[in-house]
């Protein structure tokens, strides 16, 4: 026996144990024995603490942290996370199979066990232009990689219901191999939900209400209960959890900024919220560990038991789940919030760098003609990814929408950035700034789910152009412009989505960017100025979105007009 963890309480799936030591040899748990009954080369005293299985994030887009997989590992391991089920569809929408390959290779050798679901919808719909198109034949070779678990979130629900041949071929491929197929079905209910599940979809992470959680479980699906940087709905969704259905519930982040992970924790925030909402700690732990392991076929992790991999998170209490020690593959990986076992340094290939190709831009690119006095507006919903359609009175100047004359409204632009097509969509956004505020500047980012075109919110065409040109010259990232001057810029050179810097360095820069952003503009409550804006381009979440092809009505699955 090489290692013995002593003096602690522990969770073993269905009950708490005390007076038991955990024996570890190599990367395996070799026994649970009475305290002091076995000698080991190394004794780790965990008196007063509780040993839990290392946490599992059941659905996450690593790219949303804006870190590469290796640096993401260094961020979340000290938070007690041992395994993540990642969907690399962000970078796949920019770089196709090359992006998937980069993520898998960059994750190799990390202490964090990074498993992948293959992107099912690149692009998410035919109503936008991404950097690549992936079909079943493109995905098939990746299923031979042991890091790949299944097929990632199927977002094109209308395509499934209509029997889209290419989409169903991807689902059939995964099912033929016995792999799970994740879903993405916001607002879908009744017979359409049953048809979606019957197509082979095994989970959904897009629930917004307890009723939606219950409906999916009734259809035999697992539900990934989400608490991310923009979508913060876990407290609401937990109202659906009962002792009878808890085994079908998993925790996930989906999309979370690095600075948010550092501030609120990774999976600990889910555990903390669950206990605050009255869920027994044991049940919460299962939802953060074994439930996800069982659903995704991870047979070595999720429990503290003989023969299982020694992936353990040690906490000092079961209220806020403060993580003090993390053991992965039997090694001490982190302690007191500091990474000890760092991921190997990886060289970033030139082929994934500097991907902003918009073609020429001018102020006219951002001109939004309106002939009437009313407009169809995208209204943001605080702390959610859903949007609503709103008809608002607007003021124009020379026949063009003038954000400077419309308090509470900003102009939104999505510009195709992959193939210099010249495509651009324009819309009006409410709920981004306070109702009585004006935005005398612009915010732009090359993160715009899921096709990741260039997205810009602003109060003047000149500032929006300045922001766009800044990112075109930089090769991707986030930029803040006020009255013609670039006030802050954060480069994201990897596909325009991720930094090459460490988590520690990037979080400091990201925090400074956000501080500057919030000091210059009056954003509405419950809005992440970057992440919330980035999701306004995703045409698979109701109700109204903007792509590089125009304003899109998700409910009708058809384009609409700003003009009323």
Specify the residue positions occupied by each region the protein language model found.
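Histidine/acidic residue-rich metal-binding segments in metalloenzymes
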Residues: 133-153, 159-225, 231-251, 262-283, ...
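Divalent-metal coordination cores built from histidine and acidic residues
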Residues: 73-180, 244, 487-490
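Short, small-residue-biased leader/transition segments that mark boundaries at the very start
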Residues: 1-12
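Metal-associated gating/positioning segment near the N- to mid-region
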Residues: 35-38, 43-109, 462
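Hard-cation-handling environments
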Residues: 293-410, 419, 539-544
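Non-catalytic interaction/regulatory modules that flank or connect domains
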Residues: 365-459, 463-466, 472
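His/Asp/Glu-enriched, well-ordered alpha-helical/loop segment
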Residues: 240-321, 327, 446-457, 468-472, ...
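Catalytic centers of hydrolytic enzymes
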Residues: 410, 427-451, 457, 461-564
